Amino acid sequence: MDLLIYGVNGHMGSLIKNLAEKDSYWRVIGGVDSEMSDDPMNNRYDVVVDFSHPSALQDVLQLCKEKKIPLVIGTTGFSKEQLEDIKFASAKIPILQSTNMSLGMNLLFRLVEQTAAVLKDKSDIEVIESHHNRKKDAPSGSARTIVESIEKGLGEEKKHQHGRVGECPREKGEIGIHAIRGGNIVGYHEANFINDLETIKIVHEAHNRSVFAQGALDAAKFIMDQEPGLYTMKDLLNLMV
């Protein structure tokens, strides 16, 4: 199959390219970034993987819609309007979008949702994420997805408390969200469900960024067989169970 990578010279794009080159499943591997292009409009690709920048979204969607190419989106930091654009495009092409391509991390999303559904309001919930000192956004997209998964399990949205300073007693029902930045931490996320008798701690730690690249290639293989619609890594997990 022929693969096109948007953001091919970025950290994730280059990892995906290197892994794909070692997998005989991929026959042609093309790349697009801000400095070079394989002229995707003049070539036919079987799937596109996007790890570029939110500013490139319209170009990516236009290409995939015109050429009817399935799309995997790993880019984060989209505006609400851009998320709506993705949803609209998924009516014409299959799109898999995920804030984290690690299968293990997506298992964590499922586990925190199930835990929240059982415990309801019986625990204080705190989410902690740690990343390298070059990461620009906080909290991470994965931390946001953890909170969304928790709220889905609870059946309602909660107040989000981003860090604490000074006198700020914990409000009942709020979800604390905390970000740590330092060194070369690849990615660490934990969800804590705490009450007076016990703490349930659900943790995922990525040891190497290749785990995200492999997940992206797994997602690419999955999305090529799907009908138009908006998918997540949870759909891929369901297929594996």
Swiss-Prot record:
Annotated SUPFAM superfamilies: Glyceraldehyde-3-phosphate dehydrogenase-like, C-terminal domain (SSF55347), NAD(P)-binding Rossmann-fold domains (SSF51735)
A biological process from GO: lysine biosynthetic process via diaminopimelate
A GO cellular component entry from the record: cytosol
Main location: cytoplasm
Active site: 131 (proton donor/acceptor), 135 (proton donor)
Keyword NAD part of the UniProt annotation: yes
Recorded metabolic or biological pathway in which this protein acts: Amino-acid biosynthesis; L-lysine biosynthesis via DAP pathway; (S)-tetrahydrodipicolinate from L-aspartate: step 4/4
The protein's Enzyme Commission number: 1.17.1.8
InterPro entries, per database record: DapB_C, DapB_N, DapB_N_CS, DHDPR_bac, NAD(P)-bd_dom_sf
Reactions catalysed: (S)-2,3,4,5-tetrahydrodipicolinate + NAD(+) + H2O = (2S,4S)-4-hydroxy-2,3,4,5-tetrahydrodipicolinate + NADH + H(+); (S)-2,3,4,5-tetrahydrodipicolinate + NADP(+) + H2O = (2S,4S)-4-hydroxy-2,3,4,5-tetrahydrodipicolinate + NADPH + H(+)
Pfam families in the cross-refs: DapB_C, DapB_N
Localization per record: Cytoplasm
Keywords, alphabetical: Amino-acid biosynthesis, Cytoplasm, Diaminopimelate biosynthesis, Lysine biosynthesis, NAD, NADP, Oxidoreductase
Residues annotated as binding (S)-2,3,4,5-tetrahydrodipicolinate: 132, 141-142
GO MF annotation: an example: oxidoreductase activity, acting on CH or CH2 groups, NAD or NADP as acceptor
Free-text function comment from the UniProt entry: Catalyzes the conversion of 4-hydroxy-tetrahydrodipicolinate (HTPA) to tetrahydrodipicolinate.
Similarity remark: Belongs to the DapB family.
Annotated protein name in UniProt: 4-hydroxy-tetrahydrodipicolinate reductase
Source organism of the structure: Alkaliphilus oremlandii (strain OhILAs) (Clostridium oremlandii (strain OhILAs))
